[in-house]
Structures are given as structure tokens and as C-alpha cells.
């Protein structure tokens, strides 16, 4: 009996420390979740995009002054950071999309196309590494290929 109580206490403590891996159905991340997120980006609907994010979310853009890119923390700063994407590339589109999900993590691979405000055409392959909690994005880490002009 004593070992059963000890075992239960240890398991409860471990779940408290490391989190439970059990995901409730309404919080489950699916391929459809990622598909809807990309659709919101392609619709340039910032309200719809932000509905996928938790209040304490974090965004790491592919470019910026630090090795991890420009970093935004919190829902309002993340919204502002994402708005710069739509402002800088007004016709931005994510195509050739492939999504993967494992537990509370997702990967969305895509080809970004668009035209910058100064008329430069962009086509670049990239991906987002996404981490979810309770069905909402808590971390979006974006990567782009480095495209160099041919000589």
C-alpha cells in the first residue's frame, strides 16, 4: 500500500513539473488547425490569424538583429510583428503548403510569394515551427531559405 501511495505521489509530482501529455479533444492540434491558420494568413485577416494565438505567445521572425530573428512577446506585440509582414509584402501568399503535427507541436512548410512595397518580387521556401498549449499557439518560429542572386 505504501509503495502504491508513493508511486501515485511521484507520478502526480512529475505531471505537475513536466506537464501532462494528455491533450483534451477540444485542445488537440490537427492538420486542419494548421490549414486554417495558413488560410487566415492568405486572407490577410489579422483578426483571424490572432485568434490562433495565446495571450502569452511569442513570435520569432526569420530576420532581425539577433540570431533568432526579430522577437515579439505577448499578443499585442506579436500582432504588430505580423502586421509588418502584410505591410511589407502587401500581396503575400503562402502556397505549396505541407503541414505536420505531433502532439502540441506543428510544422507548416510553404513557399512564400509576393511583391515588396518597392516592387521587388519574392519567392522563398520556408517553414514555421509551432508550439501549442490548450489549442493556442504559444510559439511561432519562422525560417526562410537564404536566396542569393545568381551571378
Residue map of PLM features:
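A solvent-exposed, acidic/Ser-Thr-rich amphipathic alpha-helical stretch
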Residues: 46, 51-101
Amino acid at each position: 500500500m505504501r509503495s502504491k501511495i508513493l508511486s501515485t505521489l511521484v507520478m502526480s509530482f512529475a505531471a505537475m513539473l513536466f506537464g501532462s501529455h494528455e491533450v483534451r479533444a477540444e485542445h488537440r492540434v490537427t492538420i486542419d488547425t494548421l490549414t486554417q491558420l495558413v488560410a487566415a494568413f492568405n486572407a490577410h485577416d489579422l483578426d483571424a490569424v490572432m485568434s490562433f494565438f495565446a495571450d502569452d505567445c511569442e513570435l520569432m521572425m526569420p530576420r532581425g538583429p539577433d540570431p533568432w530573428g526579430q522577437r515579439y512577446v505577448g499578443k499585442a506585440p506579436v500582432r504588430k510583428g505580423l502586421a509588418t509582414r502584410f505591410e511589407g509584402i502587401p500581396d503575400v501568399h503562402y502556397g505549396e503548403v505541407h503541414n505536420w503535427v505531433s502532439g502540441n507541436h506543428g510544422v507548416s512548410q510553404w513557399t512564400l510569394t509576393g511583391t515588396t512595397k518597392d516592387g521587388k518580387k519574392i519567392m522563398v521556401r520556408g517553414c514555421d515551427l509551432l508550439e501549442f498549449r490548450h489549442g493556442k499557439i504559444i510559439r511561432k518560429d519562422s525560417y526562410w531559405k537564404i536566396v542569393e542572386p545568381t551571378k
